[in-house]
Amino acid sequence: MLSSLLAMAMVMQADTTRAARETFTRCLNQFVESSVSARKTQEQFTAEYPQACAAEQTAFREAVIRRDMAMRSTRAGAEQSASLEVEDARVNYSERFEMAITPR
């Protein structure tokens, strides 16, 4: 029992997705900031945003899949988890853009 708790604690301490997540979200943030600075319209942003940070997204997605597979998740479950995490990040930064361009 104690060894199981120690193993779980070690897994929780080692966030294998942290670097990839930070790189991906930093890229999204930079894209949003540059889009706001360039005074892009919502339509321009919406057209360009899905292609932004593609390499960083792929690296993050693969890191999430590796993490989940290491925790004995199924491949399908790991892919679904990765898709949800990517979608959450993209929605978050898309909403930041919308808030930044909305007149107060």
Regions found by a protein language model. Give the residues of each.
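Short N-proximal segments of mature Sec-exported proteins
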Residues: T17-A63
